[in-house]
């Protein structure tokens, strides 16, 4: 049974003293405060991490802000590419001179070419494994070699959301399929977490249960619990008869089954209260340049809703894959993306197309961030309780450098980050350091993440 | 932007992509090409070059060719690793269809497999994740609900007027064994029967039925091809040459039934295979040969061949193929799908009608649709009612390398790509890999001249000393393909200039194959006669069959597979049979041997596991 769009309020969890009615918003999304918890510090809301990536670098002149006359971090003008984000400027945090040290081409760390290293290293903080993937230059690399921070956090701070993470892609598997250049998120070394490219699949994964009548859902959950119990018991039967290597695989599988079991048992994940029923996305051709903009919008709507409904707190959002050769005809870009990115500085036609693409990506970011910012949570908005990071897997296409990776952040993670600033580092810093900042924002007391030799402690000046 | 500008912009983009190779791929030597085919004929080769780490701290810099240690080929028959294999989406849907007799295609909502060597079924990279695990729940719920309406024979006693708890409990035992592709253990059956009884008493027959089916469909024994270590009932004498019985054992009969059926059909064993397994004689060469012959004659073998080529040749990329409307006004949406069908029809033709690898490399047949025919200068065959075969002039077309679909796939929207084509030949057909790039070159490419021919533009690579080294392995090979444009059409001129199709192959694994050639037909004929390419294709099939690339333990099997393939004039059925009859397919390492080797190869992992165990971890 599907609940009516303007159906009854169904609070999913004991609300303590914080249940308060919220107005319907014109976006069709209603915020959900069911996850709010009353602690000694007052009412707190969950923190979220949303990571967005697009391939082949940026035009730095159009990406990086211009600093104002005062020289203050808060005195800056957004770059041309980020014009769509102007209304949210106070909630942005832009970084300069942060390098992807685990990929840095100048120093050529680990196997793989720059696109591969960027994808597999950005969220794991590690160099790649050896392996069989052929990069754009014919060289070879394997998968990322460690857990990415989204999964690290999901295991530690969000054990009771229906899904630990959500990975969505707009043509993320296009052309090359599932390989190191099309994956950013890892549950562990060699264990990439695949994005879903079809909004219908995302919808089914995230919201089938949510659209079931809560009473019926309780029954379904009980049954699923019994099924998974039996599945777990059967593991013992095969485990004791399996070979050593297979036992390791079985253990990994069982660990995930147990995690899923506990998440499914959580009271929640049904439509009601402040989480609205999403419209079923249309069925679209998922690997086509004709549908890319629409699929992006569908995904962004679902991501916003998944966060609003607290289905998950960790999202990766991927526009195609690295070194892709896609065209963006809807912004008059008919060159292939990777080819364009290699153009020399005098190639104005290519630069124009790339700027148009960068701006379109910024529009997508703005669309999502605006939605999140319209969902009230306590005194602020859902965006305020989020840290959003957008970057590319390389800095600039025609050099493939990992120096000064373009990084735009938004949201303060519940007031942890001081936004509305453009922070530049005199001495070059590592993206691993930024991962540490993010982990710290989630209350994780760590000083390094990934490979410690590329860590220098959290980036200064962000909090 | 007007159309002309669009076209030029697109062209620039395309050309510049190629130049990226120039930026990245220098430091090449012929000897730096790695060759992934290993068999018993190869003498151990020392590292081709001495590691030149030039005092760099990180031993894994691209300056350092990171040569594998010298290959040591073991003597005599052996079998490689046999890790458990998660069903792919294709296998999952086939298996549930075979098990239930209806098709739901639930796996279409699963996330895609993680590829290795282009293949989806790699035992180590195709593994579970939370999204997939969650999708398994949804899939099992859809399937079990449908099965209540339309139960499989084994479970017919659970549903309907004549149903009873006792009948259903009996049925569960049978059904579990079928779903698991082996006799279920008593403890397993007891678990599912308990679930059924508990649910039946609390929630009734339907919920009990559905949850029991769900539990079976979510069990690892269903989701994986999990080979448990039971002693094989067979006491076969090892074949000549002697398999070391201390280290290896025959794969059990039910497990062999699954190896066969998933390799040749991409689905679970049928009744005949299970019956042969029950008799216990499945793993004899005679019975295996009979079964392979029977299975190859089944349409499911054709579908499996399509799956193999979809992965090996990267045909899913047709989904992304677009062509520039200005350069090719005759191009229409949907033609990429026709080109894909054309390639599939060609493969079907060479495998099942011509039947030999030689045709794969040299047949002038091209399969056309009414949409495609005018594009390639042919009249529409009104009578065909679908795809039809056209034999093109032998000087224009020879086999897979000249298929219009392949040429269009290995191209940009507005022009062909010598680079894509050459790398594809190296990687996919020669099993060769280019060395890693140097670390210290940054070149900003010049703006190319849009009126130049493709060949002229790429001459930049070889004119530049830094680029030339590596591009000599790529460009001269790719230039041979200049006779085909971005649609795979035959052409004599480009931008008003005569096409030059001269090319050169250097550094191939077979000395006799190297040297100048004129056009792809010339190249294709040379490759068709070569051992290296026949070896490579047998390696690709082996990788697909085993769910892992060959390793040194498979060297003896690889030799025998290849010899059989060659002896039978590269007939594909012989190749399939030879793979099935190989030691690698029929034997596996004994559990204690497998464990010892695994532990030796993964000391860190083992230390971690032991530490977790000591901490009383799960």
Regions from the language model: what does each represent?
Chain B
Residues 23-27:
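C-terminal motif of bacterial Sec signal peptides marking the signal peptidase cleavage site
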Residues 67, 113, 122-173, 226, ...:
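Short, functional "switch" segments adjacent to catalytic/cofactor/reactive centers
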Residues 163-212, 220-223:
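A conserved hydrophobic secondary-structure block that centers on an alpha-helix together
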Residues 179, 373, 389-528, 532-534, ...:
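Sequence context surrounding c-type heme c attachment/ligation sites in exported
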Residues 28-75, 240, 610-617:
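Ser/Thr-rich, Pro/Gly/Ala-heavy low-complexity intrinsically disordered linkers and tails
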